[in-house]
Amino acid sequence: WCIGVGFMFAPMHHSAMKHAIGPRQQLAMRTIFNVLGPLTNPAGARRQVLGVFSPALCDVMASALRDLGSEHVMVVHGLDGLDEISVSAKTTVCELANGELTHYEIDPATFGHAHDSVADLCVEDADESAALIRAALGGDTSDRSAKARSIIAMNAGAGLYVGGQADSLEAGIELAMSAMHSGKALQTLEAFAELTQAAGGA
């Protein structure tokens, strides 16, 4: 049964890293492990969108990923503090393609996805998160769902672009929006949820 979506829990694949969980929680601050984790992707991904907590890391991480054999990567930092492409501020990007690094900014207004704030996208728990995602993918017309749809489209669009499914970021965003409007995105999410719940109960 092929869904086309996967989730890998890092401590299950990097057994040594699980010993760092306790100290990291005690320190309650960013450490070298926040940088090492994405560089030790157990899937060996050669194409990815990677969010970082500081714009200073964009070039550092993209350079490291190039040295590790990556093909097409976007390392991003939202200037409102998000470690992903933001819809409430510009996003700093270092893109690796064809062995070369390119630096630029993404303005969500360019793609029709600018919003004043992402504060109301914060959730209290997993149930609220799941409900918000389902509402966004399902076409709910509230402002909150529209904002969630925008941030999903921007980041999924970037993934489609670096993954070779779209020729540009703009085309990737359009593909992502099309998948949501058609219901295909929600259908895939529900199939993934069903599969993982069945596996968890096995």
Model-predicted regions and their roles:
Residues 1-202:
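Glycine-rich anion-binding loops and their surrounding alpha/beta cores
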